[in-house]
């Protein structure tokens, strides 16, 4: 038990330092190795903390976020909320709990969009949508199980890109975007239209990101 607590503490400290350094040095193994060096963590210990290095750091951060979101969501009476309001609330909590990652997210997205990481990215996006639907109490096990998660994955990715460009106070614009997007899923807005929104947001994000690099 004590060893687990020590390992968990080291993981958290290293992941936090990594996130701080990512905007400057990128989401990479080299960045993680440099962070470990700063904290006097040997490569052998690092391999125990994060066996797949920068990939496992990402999984660790996602798991942390999900734990916080679940705890916050279950801290109030959510049983009377409609399904769409449950989804909206959970998504808002996810972005609120990710606020400290905002500066690192452009590099994280570049990492996830590498050709060799695409399948992993799709899997993570599906798992994220699955987490949100399950926490909302979704019990579907038919075709709608996949269509719901597919649509929510599109919405989550679109919201992520929108959020990165959001300069509004307390991210109110992102919350409005979440509300309209989730209503779109529930009210049957076509997947084609959702994909067009995502494409437009992605083009806007990457054009801004490239401008900031020049």
What does each of the following model-derived ranges do?
Residues 64-75:
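Conserved phosphoryl-transfer catalytic core
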Residues 191-214:
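Long, charge-rich low-complexity segments
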Residues 138-197:
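Hydrophobic/aromatic-rich alpha-helical bundle segments in the mid-to-C-terminal region
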Residues 8-43, 52-59, 63:
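Short, amphipathic alpha-helix enriched in basic
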Residues 116-138, 149-153, 157:
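Amphipathic alpha-helical packing segments from all-alpha helical-bundle domains
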Residues 1-6:
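Short, Lys/Arg-enriched N-terminal segments with co-localized hydrophobic residues
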Residues 73-107:
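Hydrophobic alpha-helical connector segments
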